[in-house]
Each structure stands twice: as C-alpha cells, then as structure tokens.
Amino acid sequence: MPGHALRTFQEMGMYGCPRTAKSLNATMKVLLRARMFDEALSLFEEGPEKYDVEVDDISCNTVVKMFCDMGDLRAAYRVMQGMERAGLRSDVITYMTLMAAFYKCGRHEVGDGLWNLMRLRGWVPTLATYNVRIQFLVNRGRGWQANEMARKIYVAGIKPDEITYNLIIKGFFMMGEHEMAKTVFGAMHGRGCKPNSKVYQTMVHYLCERRDFDLAFRLCKDSMEKNWFPSVDTINQLLKGLMAISKDRNGKEIMKLVTGRKPSYSYGEMKVFKDILSHRKTGR
C-alpha cells in the first residue's frame, strides 16, 4: 500500500494530473505511518526540484513528526528553523510536536523554551498543547500543578477533554492522592465531559492497586456495559480482589459480561478468568 501510494504520486504527470502540495503531503503521511522514513524524507527533499511541488507548512510538520518518531530531535528542530528561512511560519502543531518529543525524552528545559517561544510569537495554545504540558507535569510527579493548569484553562474558556481528565486522574493516583483522583473523576460529569474507555481503564486499574475493589467493580461493570473492556491484566486483578474479599457474586457478574464480549477473549484468557473464580470455590 505505501509503495503503491508512492508510485501513484510519481506517475501522476503521466496521466495529466498536476502534483500539488496536498498530494505530496498525503503521500508522505502514508509513508510515515508505514515507517518508511527514508522514502518520506526523499520525497520532501526532492519535491520542489524533481516534482515541481513547493512544500508547505503541513509538509514540514510531517517531517518534524517523522524525525521526532525517529528520536532525532536535533534534526526535527532544524526543520522548524528551515521553515522560517523558507518563508513558512511554524505553527502550534510544530511547537506541540517538538514539545511532546523533548518532554518525553526528559529534556524539559527545551520543552519549556519551545512553549515560551510559541507564546512570544503570538500563537495561542490549543487544548492539545496544554495536554502536552499536563502530560509532562504528571510524568514528573507534579499532579497538583497539572490539576491547577487544567483549572486555569477551564477558567480561560477552554474545555478540558477526556485526555486532560485521564492525565489528571492518573497523576493523582501516581502521587497516592487517591481521593483527589476520585474527586476529579466525579467532577467530569459536572463539567460536561463524560469518561471514555481510557478513563475507565485508569480508574479500575489504580483502584485495584489500592484494593478498593468495591468501587473498581462498579466502574468496571459500568464500563463493560458500554462495551469498553479494561485490559486483561486489570480484569484478572479485579477478579482476584473480589474473590479475596468474598465478593463472589460480583465476580460472577464481571465474568458474565466478559463471556458476552464481542469479539470474544481467547481460550487462554477465558481459562485464566475461570480459574480465578474456581480457586475461590475450591478454597485454593
């Protein structure tokens, strides 16, 4: 498929179809998803001369993302610098992509610098860029600061989304602030944001770790009834916990929902679930 997309772009001229930045960008994105980095970079570099197509800001942002995925952050930053020399203005997406990459590899001073540079150049942060900052704070164990940032963006008229709340909840759980995590989860509804499958997964996982199996059961059941199933490991942990506190009936309810899942779990996974329940019955 990626090779076919590349050939189609290369042969467009043979069929009287003019190549455009839009067709170049579409081809590059297909190559990027297939992790065909060399081919995507060649297309970007050869575009203006070989194919008579001028790259645009989307082309550059695609290459920035590619270098970030490759772990070559210096090259990614150079692409942003090259944009300005070419008369193209780096945008919020450029900065967000770079910030996320630098934060992820622990170079927070560069990430903070990019944030400040973005603001100085007149770009208004989007929710996605705020989420990148919140992710960084959570990873650094600064859950309270992450929560404060979420509060500020809400006051500023930017509505936090499921990603924001999931990060804040995870941040509080990681700090041991379990009650705050549950408070944030409860506050989602009041602020017009319903939890999605990832939020449920986070809640059930950490509640099981804290051995709050009653609430974990209720949330897991609610999630499964929406056809959102936590990870196999989380379900295993919940079933073991319910059996340990003699909540056999709750375990059976979870098992009933698990059995009705489409697509179904594998034979091996189902066997593990059943074994957990049977161990309680046999006293093992």
Which residue stretches match the model-derived regions?
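Alpha-helical solenoid repeat scaffolds, predominantly canonical TPR units
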Residues: 8, 43, 79, 114, ...
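Inter-helix linker motif
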Residues: 16, 35, 51-52, 71, ...
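TPR/TPR-like (Sel1-like) alpha-helical repeat modules
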Residues: 221-229, 239-246, 253-264
